[in-house]
Amino acid sequence: MGKASANNVKSDKEAAKPAAKKDENKDFQYIVRIANKDLNGERPIPLALSDLKGIGLRLGYAIAERLNLQPTKKIGELKEDEIEKLKEYVENKEYDLPDWLLNHRREPVTGKNLNLVTTDLDVQVQEDINLMKKIRSYKGIRHEKGKKVRGQRTRSNGRRGLSIGVVRKKE
C-alpha cells in the first residue's frame, strides 16, 4: 500500500509540472513579426534575427548587445516594449554599430553607412547593378552579358547555354 501511494504522489507531481510550465508561457509569442517577416519565437534573438535577409548571426548578436537584451533569451519571451524597440532598431537603416558590420557602406547619394534588410536590400542591389550597367563599367558589362563578374575562370567552368562539350583545336 505504501508503494501505491508513493506512485500516486509522483504522478501528481509530474502532472503539476506541465501545468506550471504552461502558466509561465502565457506571454510567450510563437511568432514575432519584424520587418514584414514572421520569426520563430522559439529561437534565440540572434538566430531569429538572422532569418531576416540582410542580418547575419554576428549582426544579430551585436543588435542584441546594443539593445541590452540577453542573446540567449528566446525572441518569443520578449515583452511587447522590447519587441517594439527591436523592430524600430532593425527597420531603421542607420545603425550605431561599426561600419564593417553593415552591408551598404558609403551609400553613393548620401555617403552614409546603412544596413538594409529584406526588400530594401534587394531593391538597392538591383539599383547598384543598373547603375554599373548605365555607366558602362567593367562589372556592368559583365552583368549585361551574363558572364562571371568577380574574376572567376570562364574557360572551363560555368558553361551554360547552347555550347555542347569541349571545342578541340584542329590538328
Swiss-Prot record:
Q: Where is this region: Disordered?
A: 1-22, 142-171
Sorted alphabetically, which Gene3D superfamilies does this protein's record hold? Answer: 1.10.8.50, 30s ribosomal protein s13, domain 2
User: What do the Gene Ontology cellular component annotations say?
Assistant: cytosol; small ribosomal subunit
Q: Which InterPro entries match?
A: Rbsml_uS13_C, Ribosomal_uS13, Ribosomal_uS13-like_H2TH, Ribosomal_uS13_archaeal, Ribosomal_uS13_CS
Superkingdom of this protein's organism: Archaea
Renumbered to this chain, the Basic residues biased-composition regions fall at: 142-158
Molecular function (GO) terms for this protein are: rRNA binding; structural constituent of ribosome
One GO biological process term: translation
Give the compositionally biased regions (Basic and acidic residues): 10-22
Cystine pairs annotated here are none
Cite the Pfam families for this sequence.
Ribosomal_S13 (PF00416)
Q: Which UniProt keywords apply?
A: Ribonucleoprotein, Ribosomal protein, RNA-binding, rRNA-binding
What does the record give as the function of this protein? Located at the top of the head of the 30S subunit, it contacts several helices of the 16S rRNA. In the 70S ribosome it contacts the 23S rRNA (bridge B1a) and protein L5 of the 50S subunit (bridge B1b), connecting the 2 subunits; these bridges are implicated in subunit movement.
Task: Please state which protein family the record places this protein in.
Answer: Belongs to the universal ribosomal protein uS13 family.
Subunit = Part of the 30S ribosomal subunit. Forms a loose heterodimer with protein S19. Forms two bridges to the 50S subunit in the 70S ribosome.
Please state what the protein is called: Small ribosomal subunit protein uS13
